[in-house]
Amino acid sequence: MDKQMVEVLNNIHFAERYQALRTQYSFDSKESFATYDNSYVLAMLREIGYASVKYWRKENFFQARKKSNIYEFRYHMCIKYGIAELMWYAMKNNKYYAGGSFPNLEYDLLNPENRNHLPNFRNYEDLRGILTIAFQMCEDMTAQFLKVYGDVT
């Protein structure tokens, strides 16, 4: 991770926010909500504010895209077995430029001794909470990324 990406994440207090998200949505795996309706989740994502969102059946994840002048940002949400794996990517010329899964970004920032668990959910209400917080974090990362890296054509 380069210094600019560290600056992006530190400026939005990424590690603290992700830790708070994981703590708030930490339940016994026996309570997890493994069966959900993809079309319901798509509608929920649109209500939250995710734009250009679609479900990729083959890879089994949801993706939202946001474009700027020279970058495209991709917000991925893989929700299986009641667990939410969240990802944020910046693409340039259709190639990976920066980003990663939230746990990997946290690890690169803090290098914790042990890997932490992913947020999990028991119902649609929990899932909405996770996706709402994740959306704001992704939007903040995108805005801060554009400030730090610039968006000149």
Spans of features found by a protein language model:
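Short secondary-structure junctions
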Residues: R46-K58
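Surface-exposed charge patches
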Residues: A43
